[in-house]
Structure formats: C-alpha cells, structure tokens
C-alpha cells in the first residue's frame, strides 16, 4: 500500500511539472551597427517609473511586424510597392519589452512608399529637320521708305538683298496672298505692281524708279494702318523669285510655282513719320509654304572671315551652361540659340524652362551651321527634339 501511495504522489508531481508554463524567450542581442537610444531623464533617475510604463509582454506575439504608431502612415492610392527587404541594412523589429515611444533610428530603413516614386522619364521624340536652300534673301531690316527727290510727297521703296542665282523681284501694294503663293494687287488701278529682273550677286540694292512711288495723301488712315491679320491684305509685299527671266519656263515662273521668298509688311506712323514694319517672311519651295522665324543668337555662332581679336574673344559664342562648347541648339518656341547639344540633352531631363527667358520649352532644335559666306543664306542641318 505504501508503494502504491508513493507512486501515485510521484505521478501527480510529474503531471504538475509537465503543465508548467515555459519561460518567455530571452530578448535578442542589441544591434552592433547602431547603439540603443538613451533613456529619458526621468526614466534614468527613477527605474520604478520605467517598470511602470513598460507594457506587459504578449505571450502570443503577432508574427507580422507591427510598425510603430508614430511612424506608419496609410499609403495614398496608386503608390508604388515597397522595395524588397534588405537583410544587410535592415534591423530586427523591437522587442516587446522596448518602449514604442523611442523606436531605433534604423527603423527609417522602412521607407514610406510615397517617397519611392521615381520621376517619370519625359517623352522625347526625335525628328529630322528639313534643309532648305534659300536662293534669294531680302534683308528685312533694310526695307524702308525714301522720299522721291523729283516728286515731293511721294515715297519710294528700297531694300537690300542677296541672290545666288538670277531672278525677278516684284513689289505689290495692298497685296493678297492666294493658296498657291500668288500675290494679287487689290488696288492695281492706283498702284500697279513693279517688277525688276536681277542677276546673282551679294549686297544688291533695290529702289523704285522716280515717279512710281506711293502718295499716302490719297488713302485714308484706315486703309493704310488697318490690321493686316483681319483682312489678309498687306499694304506692301515683296516677292523675290529665283528663276531666270525670259527662259522657256517663263509661264511657270509667272504662276508662282518656282522657289520664291515673300516679305509682307505694314505701315506704321511714328512721330508723324510713316515707316515700314515687316510682319512675316515666307519661303515657297517646291510647292510647299514655309514661314521664316528669327533665331536669337545664331549670328554669334557663324564663323565669318573676320579673325580679329575682338571676334575671337566674343563671349556670345559659347554655351550659356558649360561656357566652353559653341552654341548649336535652339529653344522653341522662344527661339533662343543659347546651348550646346550636350547640355541641352542633359537639361531637358532637369527642367522645361529656357535658360534665357524662363519660358516653357516645347522643342529643342539642333542646327549645324556650315559657315557664312556673307550672303545670309546659310543652310542648316539639324534635329528637333519634342518634349511633353
């Protein structure tokens, strides 16, 4: 009987030992890369306070990592997913014994998804520019009115032009342009068109013959200074055709199908004096109409025949960004030629503003200027870059 009682007591004691709760796992060793942050002053001075604010350990910890309440934010809709976990740089989650109010600084390794969104690469379209040869070029800054010495009150039209081939110049008053680039004089009975043949040459000067000038006193101010954009009638138009006169294709030349440059101008009154202002210049090449645009700074990039010291040290020839390479890229639509192609390719990924006027950039036009022979008819080979 004693043996049975003894064995029963041992069995009960053995069963009690089997149901004893296992002790909690020891805390992980601290990270060697970053020291734990210091405790607050009041906790260091009073350890009892630290024990009071320490949360009771959870016997069933959640296997999913819980972000500190002061750190986690709900990501906005459409945010990029988090990058893969980096086992070399990340630190283990804080032990439940640690206070969440002072999470380790290394927890910043878990980035907020909104800051990881990469900037989209701008869409860039490359197009080849068209090279056009302009055989006749009227220098629009030279277009002016001169008083007729033999006929007081009348004014003669004069200008300077360059021509690489022979051709014909026509001056039309109150001209209207048709679809095939043909100019029609709307007041031909009062001011008939003036036509003059020319030979090839540079720096040629045109001037109306005496007695054929315009008398502004016979016209109303509304007719002279009316906006040409409203009526599509320009008070003055000059058409320079690059076509030999008297050839077998004379009828084709009169139809306007030959290469030509058209300069359209209006009259303006400045301090009682009537002056000419050029509105636009048009190129008609192989049946296609092109409108010429000024490029600011292209004159500084053309290497002329003058090799003087002042020209060699001209600071306007270099790129405004690197200050070393020559300018060969124009910003559109402001038309500032101010950069080299290398800086332009880098700049378009950083900003969409012109370095000169800070206007938005729509296209970058690279122009390779072959040289300047003094004619002003330089041709260019370039590439346009469209950025959206």
From Swiss-Prot:
Metabolic or biological pathway, per its Swiss-Prot or TrEMBL entry: Protein modification; protein ubiquitination
Catalytic class of the enzyme: transferase
Lipid-acceptor residues (N-myristoyl glycine): 2
Zinc finger (RING-type): 319-358
Compartments where located: Cell membrane
Tissue note: Expressed in the vascular tissues in both phloem and xylem parenchyma cells.
Pro residues composition bias: residue spans: 22-40
Gene Ontology MF: a single term: zinc ion binding
An annotated GO cellular component: plasma membrane
InterPro entries reported for this sequence: LOG2-like_mRING_C3HC5 (IPR045195), MGRN1/RNF157-like (IPR045194), Znf_RING (IPR001841), Znf_RING/FYVE/PHD (IPR013083)
Record keywords, A-Z: Cell membrane, Lipoprotein, Membrane, Metal-binding, Myristate, Transferase, Ubl conjugation pathway, Zinc, Zinc-finger
Region (DAR2 domain): 159-281
Region described as Disordered: 1-43, 368-388
Keyword Cell membrane: yes
Protein origin, superkingdom: Eukaryota
Primary role: Acts as an E3 ubiquitin-protein ligase, or as part of E3 complex, which accepts ubiquitin from specific E2 ubiquitin-conjugating enzymes and then transfers it to substrates (in vitro). Required for GLUTAMINE DUMPER 1(GDU1)-induced amino acid secretion and for amino acid homeostasis. Ubiquitinates GDU1 (in vitro).
Domain notes: The RING-type zinc finger domain mediates binding to an E2 ubiquitin-conjugating enzyme.
Family affiliation: Belongs to the RING-type zinc finger family. LOG2 subfamily.
Stored PANTHER family: MAHOGUNIN (PTHR22996), RE60872P-RELATED (PTHR22996:SF0)
Assembly: Interacts with GDU1.
Protein name: Probable E3 ubiquitin-protein ligase LOG2
Native source organism of the sequence: Arabidopsis thaliana (Mouse-ear cress)
